[in-house]
C-alpha cells in the first residue's frame, strides 16, 4: 500500500513534549541563581507533573503514545542501531527502538531528579541528595543531546523531518497506521493546569512589591517574606 502523510502523534503528546523541553531548559538555566529560585522550583514541579501525565498517557493515550507501542527489548535496539549504521534503517511509524530507551531513561532520571530536588528544597537528607539531584539533571542533559542527535540522524536517514512531525503530528506511513483523532480536550486541560500552576508563582512578585510599598508608606517594618525562596536547597 502506498505511503502518505498520516496523523501519528496526538495533540496531548505534542503539547507534553514541548512543555517538558521548556521546563527542563528553564530549570537547568535557573539552577544556580538564588534570585529566581521560585521560578526554578516551579519549573521543577512542572517537569515532574508533566512526567506524571506522560505515565498516565502512556496507558490511556492514542496508539503511538502508549508504552505498549514502543516496548522494545535489547535485541530490537541493537538491530535498529545496526540497520542505522548500515544506512538502511528500519522505518517505524511511532518511536523507534533506540528512541524508546531514551524516553524511558529520561522518565526515570526525571523522577529521581524531582524527588531528590523536592527533598533538598524541604531540608530533608543531606549533601548526597543535592549531588543526586544535580547528577541526574546533568545525565538528563546528556540524554537530551543524544535525543537531538538521534532526531537529526533519523531525519536524514528517513528523509523525514522528525522535529516538525512533533509539531504537526504527521509522519509518513500507511493510511491504516494513522490514529483516529488529536484529543484536543486533553491537550487544553493539560495547558490549563500548567497555566494555573504558574499563575500563582507569577503573582508573588507583584504581591510582595505591593506589600513592601505599603509598609514603606506607613513607615513600618519591612514585611517578612514567606516565599519558598528563603528556604535553603535547590529543586528541579
Which sequence ranges carry the predicted segments?
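Membrane-embedded alpha-helical bundles that constitute the cytochrome b-like, heme-associated redox core
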Residues: 1-236
Amino acid at each position: 500500500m502506498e505511503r502518505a502523510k498520516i496523523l501519528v502523534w496526538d495533540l496531548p503528546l505534542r503539547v507534553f513534549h514541548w512543555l517538558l523541553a521548556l521546563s527542563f531548559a528553564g530549570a537547568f538555566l535557573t539552577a544556580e541563581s538564588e534570585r529566581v529560585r521560585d521560578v526554578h522550583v516551579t519549573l521543577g514541579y512542572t517537569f515532574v507533573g508533566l512526567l506524571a501525565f506522560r505515565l498516565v498517557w502512556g496507558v490511556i493515550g492514542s496508539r503511538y503514545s502508549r508504552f505498549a507501542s514502543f516496548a522494545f527489548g535489547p535485541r530490537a535496539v541493537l538491530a535498529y542501531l545496526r540497520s542505522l549504521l548500515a544506512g538502511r534503517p528500519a522505518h517505524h511509524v511511532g518511536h523507534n527502538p533506540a528512541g524508546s530507551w531514551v524516553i524511558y531513561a529520561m522518565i526515570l532520571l526525571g523522577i529521581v531528579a524531582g524527588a531528590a530536588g523536592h527533598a533538598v528544597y524541604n531540608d530533608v537528607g543531606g549533601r548526597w541528595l543535592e549531588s543526586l539531584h544535580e547528577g541526574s539533571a546533568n545525565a538528563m542533559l546528556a540524554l537530551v543531546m543524544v535525543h537531538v542527535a538521534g532526531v537529526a540522524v533519523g531525519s536524514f536517514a528517513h528523509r523525514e523531518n522528525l522535529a516538525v512531525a512533533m509539531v504537526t503530528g504527521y509522519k509518513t506511513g500507511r493510511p491504516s497506521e494513522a490514529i483516529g483523532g488529536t484529543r484536543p480536550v486533553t491537550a487544553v486541560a493539560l495547558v490549563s493546569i500548567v497555566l494555573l500552576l504558574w499563575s500563582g508563582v507569577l503573582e508573588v512578585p507583584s504581591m510582595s512589591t505591593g506589600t513592601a510599598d505599603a509598609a514603606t508608606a506607613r513607615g513600618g517594618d519591612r514585611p517578612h517574606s514567606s516565599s519558598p525562596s528563603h528556604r535553603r536547597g535547590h529543586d528541579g
